Amino acid sequence: MQNPYGHFTNNTTEDREASSQGGPFGQSLNRPLDYAGSFPSLTYNNNNFIANQQPSLPLPEPRLSWNNVNQVSNPLMVTPLPGLQKRMNKNIKKKLPRVSKKASALSNGVSGNVMSNSNIVGHGAVGSASGWKVEMGGSDELERRKRRAERFSQGPSATTNSNDNLNEDFANLNAISSKSHQYDKKIHVVGRCQTLEKSYLRLTSEPNPDLIRPPNILQKMYCLLMDKYQSKTATYTYLCDQFKSMRQDLRVQMIENSFTIKVYQTHARIALENGDLGEFNQCQNRIMALFENPTIPKKSYSEFICYSVLYSMLTEDYPSISHLKLKLIDDGSSEILEDEHVKMIFELSDMKLVGNYHYFMKNYLKLHKFEKCLINSFLNLEKLIFLTIICKSYNQVNLDFVKSEFNFNSIEETTNFLNEQNLTEFILNKQITDSNGKSSNIKILNTKGCRVQLIQNYMKSKKIDIKGQK
């Protein structure tokens, strides 16, 4: 009988007769095999099987891999052809792990004889079926590895860069260090320099007392600078450099008194007068921090409260204005909010926020000198927004109306403002007749035709350059 397991033959005549009658179990061997126990004693390749025993196939041999090539092959395994054997050997070599310099260094540094990880092969390692054996070098090699391990086990040296400079307060003008080198900023330094004038240089190391001026020299320098400022014999660049140098010396020596705040306030006003909003903002932040010191008298406190509100209006930081108002109430300084001028400044910020430009422009005339210097930095943009609102509300307006709303002194000044906005072609002459029959010529602005131009001008002027402050 032919079946999937090979050629099976009956051993005896009785067995053949029994099989012709259906066998001892009533089944014919000519039928397909239902289960292994149906067979009597059978022969498979001259090997006898006991009856009712399941004939089993030879177990499959393990896959040919790089670590069992030298093992004895099963006699039942078919020997591959010579050409196929060469290709198999080539594939086996490809599967072997590659040796890298890093892996070699790792394996050479291992204190042991056997590594079971086949992905790391050491320099001079010997392959085996169980793993890879590392051959250690001589005494020179061991000494070299020891020095290498010590070098990598050491912490970062003092000369390497670190992340300490992340702790620097770069919002402060007098940041002590611009590099990773740090020192204790709480060490009290007493200056010994007797030179009045000194240019500002950012500190990159510990301050040298021989290059720092003591308070008495700084007071003399302050009087010298004020004389030059009032006589207008010095440029703003020179004044700014000298004031920054004075502020640095005060900061390094940790001097916080009435003279310190006077230096910062004077520099802030001069910076406003010259349109230097960057230096003003640095001085203003330091002034507000000094006012929190209870030993310092709050002279001109309300003045710099107004400056802080106007600067927040410039940057459109209205939450800071609300926070400042709440802080004054919590600190028991609510009497400052009762001051008429301070109250007007806070109302001015509210009107700008809601877009009440009529009130905004009328109260602009009530501002003080340095307050106007601060608000002038963004006044042209507010005028442009106000003019856009007017043009969306009317089809045409008289230039006298524009003159009164924008606080211009004459029609010529109004016309110059419109010409700066590229609206010259929209200024028209119109003849009107009054109730007495008298005719006169007036200038009007065709607001309906200039709306698109105004919107384009607004988009171009939306960004304000205040030296990196916005």
UniProtKB/Swiss-Prot annotation:
Biased composition (Polar residues): 1-12, 19-30, 154-165
Residues modified to N-acetylmethionine: M1
PROSITE patterns for the chain: PCI
Keywords: Acetylation, Nucleus, Transcription, Transcription regulation
Domain spans labelled PCI: 276-450
A GO term from the CC aspect: nucleus
Listed GO biological process terms: mRNA splicing, via spliceosome
Cellular compartments annotated: Nucleus
TM segment ranges: none
Source organism superkingdom: Eukaryota
Region called Disordered, residue ranges: 1-31, 137-167
Family matches, as InterPro entries: PCI_dom (IPR000717), SAC3/GANP/THP3 (IPR045107), SAC3/GANP/THP3_conserved (IPR005062)
Extra remark: Present with 3360 molecules/cell in log phase SD medium.
Protein family membership: Belongs to the THP3 family.
General function of this protein: Forms a complex with CSN12 that is recruited to transcribed genes and required for transcription elongation. May also be involved in pre-mRNA splicing.
Assembly and binders: Interacts with CSN12 and SEM1.
Protein name: Protein THP3
Organism of origin: Saccharomyces cerevisiae (strain ATCC 204508 / S288c) (Baker's yeast)
